[in-house]
Amino acid sequence: MPENFKNFIAGEWVAPRTGAFFENRNPADWDDLIGCFPRSGPDDVTSAVASAKRGFAQWSQTPAPIRGEVLHRVGDLLVQRKEEIARAMTREMGKVLPETRGDVQEGIDTAHYAHTEGRRLFGRTVPSELRNKWAMSFRRPIGVAGLITPFNFPLAIPTWKMFPALLCGNAVIFKPAEDVPHTAHLLVEILLEAGLPPEVVQLVHGEGSVVGKAMVEHPEVPVVSFTGSTETGSVIGTTCGRMHKRLSLEMGGKNAMIVMDDADLDLALDGVLWGAFGTTGQRCTATSRLVVHERVHDTLVRMLCDRAERLHLGAGLDAKTDVGPLINEAARKKVEYYVGVGRDEGAQVLIGGERPTGKGLERGWFYKPTVLGGVRAGMRVEQ
């Protein structure tokens, strides 16, 4: 039987009030069931907010250097468990081990950096225009921060949001993407092992349209940080603006790499391959457009197709793999759809453009690395 994981609310691992769970499977092998995770509802968010407020009352009174020491211990624990977490992350979301090891390293670096900032939360003194008066400013914690994070950097992005918030004395409610709940579970375990007071962090799994919405709309969550799609971020921005909340948004992009005729083509190509196919192209900063000077166009495209065709497609836990699976069925269908749109508009599929065949690829969300040529300004795939 698969393990039923739980939310972390009010200092305890608890089942969702809905009683519902969803499956978390390896995108490289559908038969590999990692576990079942809570499909939480608004009542779970309400409980998490109440607990986080209690945690905030305690944590905000803890001296910042002491808060920093907790984060230093978090960083040390991440160092100790780096390989374990990287392998769990690759199993859960598919990207290759060198990338997930880098993901954990981002968390380590962020923890150790945040630790040092605990002794640098400086205020300011300001000259006054009035006699016998002086003015000053100092930093104060805000309250409960709601953090909504994506699947593509399951540990790095949560730490970028969470560690500064914790260092500054805030409590956090953490809502990870539905595709990467296990990595989130491991991160919260480490926070607790490092000595973070239990009610300072809450972990609520579930759908963004339910859990994320309830968190964003809750009047006692004054800070929201979101990384994800532009469409969802726009809705969150509207809600937070209406409710006068503090907000951080990091959303999608359509990124171009420009190669001029005096470029080092080998160096440029390294950048293109990493930008386009790293994390299987599933990054807000991924290179989805390549604009090439006409003098070197044919040469660079030929080099690109040759290198891209030699990228090894497979499970991220395999040391030979260069490109892993897409995160889920919807992601693969979206790629297939836009390749079809490009064909219909007159673009040429130079390589890829289809699902792969072969041993080990039939039970995962794999798609061949694809290059479209003959793309003109104004085509949907170019926009």
Residue ranges and their predicted role:
Residues 1-36, 69, 73, 121-148, ...:
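Terminal low-complexity tails and localization/encapsulation signals of metabolic enzymes
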Residues 31, 67, 89, 111, ...:
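Residue-level signal for inorganic ion chemistry
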Residues 46-49, 68-75, 79, 86, ...:
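Hydrophobic face of alpha-helices
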Residues 73-81, 186, 190-196, 269-270, ...:
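Generic non-transmembrane alpha-helical segments
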Residues 123-267, 320:
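Rossmann-like NAD(P) dinucleotide-binding subdomain of oxidoreductase/dehydrogenase enzymes
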Residues 223, 231-380:
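ALDH superfamily catalytic-core signature
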